[in-house]
Amino acid sequence: MAPQMGYDRAITVFSPDGRLFQVEYAREAVKRGTTAVGIKAADGVVLLVDKRITSRLVEAESIEKIFQIDEHIGAATSGLVADARSLVDRARVEAQVNRVSYDEPIGVEVISKKICDHKQTYTQYGGVRPYGTALLIAGVDDNKPRLFETDPSGALLEYKATAIGAGRNAVVEVFEADYREDMNMDAAILLGMDALYKAAEGKFDAGTLEVGVVSLEDKKFRKLGPEEVENYVQQILEKHKGTESSE
């Protein structure tokens, strides 16, 4: 009998070596998801997602992986999209309740902790399953860019730059080599796209990329339009075209 037999059927039962297999399986769903990237810059924070469209018959606009939570907060997701939408809807309600109750926008760390608390409860009660999605939550607090990662267990970490999804390892390798805290948002977007290019082995274009930004200047979340994304993509393609031709 396999060592985990029986222990992977109940979310509330630890295996003898201290593991919750259902939580680990939920993390595997994230690892198989599309690659999402978050980067803090000197003047804001950026989110990028490679939507990985698998069929030319799919309308690219119908696939959404970056969501607005509040005026100053956005989130990128990897894993089960339906689970992510449920969490995003909950986060939006929490943000609205905070505005009504306190007449001020909710903090990025506060909303991240609330989502993590909710995800954590789904790891300790019977009759439910963990959320099979991870979120990168980005925004601006007190004139500082903030970037948090939430995983299916409810764990919360703040990063300068990170990634979730299938290409995480390749992206993080690029970040560890090239990330600088003093880079601006333009440079951060190009770094993120460069990392996604390498993670996807060059198989990406403007139609598969989604980009969201929050700047310190106006503290507003917005998604980049197709022409803006195309401009950055062309810079990356030109860079790698030059690199490949010189080799």
UniProtKB/Swiss-Prot annotation:
In terms of PROSITE patterns, this protein maps to: PROTEASOME_ALPHA_1, PROTEASOME_ALPHA_2
Query: Which subcellular locations apply to this protein?
Result: Cytoplasm
| HAMAP family assigned | Proteasome_A_A
SUPFAM superfamilies tied to this protein: N-terminal nucleophile aminohydrolases (Ntn hydrolases)
Q: Which Pfam families match?
A: Proteasome (PF00227), Proteasome_A_N (PF10584)
Activity: how regulated? The formation of the proteasomal ATPase PAN-20S proteasome complex, via the docking of the C-termini of PAN into the intersubunit pockets in the alpha-rings, triggers opening of the gate for substrate entry. Interconversion between the open-gate and close-gate conformations leads to a dynamic regulation of the 20S proteasome proteolysis activity.
Which InterPro entries is this protein grouped with? Ntn_hydrolases_N (IPR029055), Proteasome_alpha (IPR050115), Proteasome_alpha-type (IPR023332), Proteasome_asu_arc (IPR019982), Proteasome_asu_N (IPR000426), Proteasome_sua/b (IPR001353)
Function, as annotated: Component of the proteasome core, a large protease complex with broad specificity involved in protein degradation.
Quote a single Gene Ontology cellular component term: proteasome core complex, alpha-subunit complex
Q: What is this protein called?
A: Proteasome subunit alpha
Q: Oligomeric state and partners?
A: The 20S proteasome core is composed of 14 alpha and 14 beta subunits that assemble into four stacked heptameric rings, resulting in a barrel-shaped structure. The two inner rings, each composed of seven catalytic beta subunits, are sandwiched by two outer rings, each composed of seven alpha subunits. The catalytic chamber with the active sites is on the inside of the barrel. Has a gated structure, the ends of the cylinder being occluded by the N-termini of the alpha-subunits. Is capped at one or both ends by the proteasome regulatory ATPase, PAN.
Q: Which UniProt keywords apply?
A: Cytoplasm, Proteasome
Family note: Belongs to the peptidase T1A family.
Q: Which GO terms describe its molecular function?
A: threonine-type endopeptidase activity
Q: Which domain of life is it from?
A: Archaea
Any single biological process term in GO: proteasome-mediated ubiquitin-dependent protein catabolic process
